[in-house]
Amino acid sequence: MAQLPARHVPLIGSLFGWLKRPPPSLDALAWRDMRRSVRLLHTLSAEDEARLQSLSAAFLHEKTITPLAGLALDDAQRMQLAALCCLPLLGCGAGGLRGWSQLLVYPEAFRVQRSHVDAAGVLHEYDDELIGESWDAGPLILSWADVQADLADPFEGYCVAIHEMAHKLDALDGAIDGTPPLPRAWQREWAADFQSQYDAFCEQVD
């Protein structure tokens, strides 16, 4: 797979670099305490962890985290959410936070109403139960119970917060097609690597 550079992706940095006052740094002791509960962070290098801490500070400064349906979140839990959501940004920087402003958190899986029109023109309406959702130019939505399940078993291979943030990165260029904003020179290599990995995945599950 094509590897993103350790530093910010140049295109994102140039397109989405915001001339804003830096957010206040996170309390070092609070970060250390939070880190103990997020084993995914234990594998990070010191450099990557420092970058993640800075990104998490930006996340908490710029995003409104709204618990719903009677859920209450303390500062440590909000920091957990910020850290998980910012893990996919380690290769692209704070520009990956652009385009949305609110994280909604339900206590557990939530239901949404769906509809679609089939080939015969018949409208079908139904309820769908979700553990996370990312709206184009809208909020990111998570189930707190499933975030906690991911923290309890972090190497299972799925993390709903990371998954939904990947959709936010995908949408940065205006097209939800599995490809985040990339320098033109990387686009062909990205497509080839993505197709190769997808084909390998299909072989495993077929």
Predicted regions and their residues:
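Charged, compositionally biased N-terminal leader segments and the immediate start
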Residues: 2-32
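Metalloprotease/metallohydrolase-associated module, dominated by Zn2+-dependent proteases
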Residues: 17, 21, 30, 35-42, ...
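Short, surface-exposed loop/turn segments at secondary-structure junctions
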Residues: 65-72
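Catalytic glutamate of the conserved HExxH
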Residues: 157-173
